[in-house]
């Protein structure tokens, strides 16, 4: 098993987004922010080959006239690498992840980072994994039009309100709409194939917007959706509380998301429950592929054992490196895996849907070359992630659904270790 070392001390210096501001040794809402998303993003950057082409940032000019702006009022942006050959009329839209802001302070903080302002976004990004333009790295989508839509609203491209006093613009839904208008004008309206994808908070966004994406395109266009590490569960944390539910409740309340959530869900559940994908995926009409690790690193760090639920630090070593967990802690993770499998059970009954749940301690596998398609990539039933997604999208195989055996049986994992 290959383990990947991720140096949190270095990452803190590069901190530029907040999943939810959590304090160390502070109870009043102030202190050093922790950010697992940035830590994982830093690891992905370190894994990229130096020869990877850089794709420039394009701002959506005129978006501000429609109120489609980042948290700080700046223009939203994207990176586009044009398709070629047989893929010239095929489109892949990758929605960026990066946590959420769940209160006034964390949303204000994001205004000073790329997660809330295009002023701080990288001027160019490396396209790897599912975004790569090389057939040997991305066999099925390498020659498609590949777009990465940047994330700067803090609510998974949802919400349409603002905080006048702090000049905070919660305009994720408008950003989604103007971005889609832009892509349609660039040629996506003539697409013969399209895939809406996303990682983490972007994976949740792919779930939230999947059917909406389908409706944008002609019925003759083949449209499917992929959610990578987007199955955030409404789980009990190590203290018996509901850390992620509390966070999501803040997101829904602060950004006034109620009106943007699925009415099919809100007709029988509260708005916060309808931000959890486990209550949404079975009602999606468009074919959807769920890719997730059974022991999602972000959820372990921020939902199951955040510092607020573990003030004594009993879980600190275990959540940083699973090899340092005791048997009861591993059992807690096994119960989380069982919840994951239960959450996708109804979804998996549909023949049109795809599933890939591997028993790894990781987060986001589509944009990392080592986990998407490499010689030693993780495998399930002899298939790497890219191969399974391709089999499902192009209907090369029936019933593309793979669920791994429980930890520690999978020796192909690329596990994340935080030190």
Curated annotation (Swiss-Prot):
Domain of life: Eukaryota
Alphabetized GO MF terms: hydrolase activity
GO biological process: cell wall organization
Keywords carried by this UniProt record: Cell wall, Cell wall biogenesis/degradation, Glycoprotein, Hydrolase, Secreted, Signal
EC number per UniProt: 3.1.1.-
Main localization of the protein described in the UniProt heading: secreted
Signal sequence region: 1-20
Coiled coil regions in record: none
Matches recorded under InterPro entries: PAE/NOTUM
Residues listed as glycosylation sites in the UniProt record: 133, 326
GO (cellular component) term, any one: extracellular region
Null allele phenotype: No visible phenotype under normal growth conditions.
Enzyme class: hydrolase
Name by which UniProt lists this protein: Pectin acetylesterase 6
Top-level taxonomy: Eukaryota, Viridiplantae, Streptophyta, Embryophyta, Tracheophyta
